[in-house]
Amino acid sequence: MVQNSHWLLTKNIIMQKAYLLFGEAAASLQLILDAGNSLQYDLLTPSPKIARGENYKGLPYVMLDYPRHFSKEDIFAFRTMFWWGNFLSFTWHLKGRYALAYRQVIISHHKQLADAGFHLCISEDEWQHDFEATNYFPIHDLSTEAFAMLLDNKAFTKLALKIPLDQWNHANEALMKNYLLILELVKISYQGGEKDPLPGNPKADFGL
């Protein structure tokens, strides 16, 4: 293995392809968000961040965070991940005031999220990304009542979608389809009801 330079070159090519895929996804998201003047939101202001590493549970990965807002108390992030030999994934990660703000619209769209193949994080560790049974549970296997109860009992919410690596050639389309689904939930949350879910932030139309 140490004498096989071809293996390392192949790995570098694949990692670069993942990096380019996420760059395209980030650019498409920026166009959508810019069209809705949504960059006025503090949580959408930071530019896309693409990182790569060599050791998530012993394997290389590439990760895109955009839009992204991380603080000790509050999180709003779209996290897209390529995990070597496992999957591509898209996660909507909410914590603190953002988890509270979007809870009701998430519950009311239980069926849409289930039909799209999303999973709900049931782990107490919000920084685990695998789809083991101790970490994620398929939303389509949860009743609306059970779904709501699980959301109520956690300080954070993570909704995640797994894209098998054998669907790589269609990954960009799958990512955009599900980015738009979640952005539609964000849009509904801002437009619905009498109370702005995030007081002090101007409302936006994502133009979907």
Regions found by a protein language model. Give the residues of each.
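Short, internal acidic amphipathic alpha-helical interface segments
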Residues: 97-151
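Short, solvent-exposed polar/charged micro-motifs at secondary-structure junctions
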Residues: 48-53, 129-134, 168-173
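Charge-rich, low-complexity N-terminal segments
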Residues: 1-71, 75
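A structural detector for beta-sheet-dominated domains
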Residues: 67, 121-123, 162
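Aromatic- and glycine-enriched beta-alpha-beta binding-site module
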Residues: 55-115
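Long, solvent-exposed, polar/charged low-complexity segments
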Residues: 1-34, 135-208
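Short, charged low-complexity intrinsically disordered segments located at boundaries
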Residues: 51-60, 95, 135-142
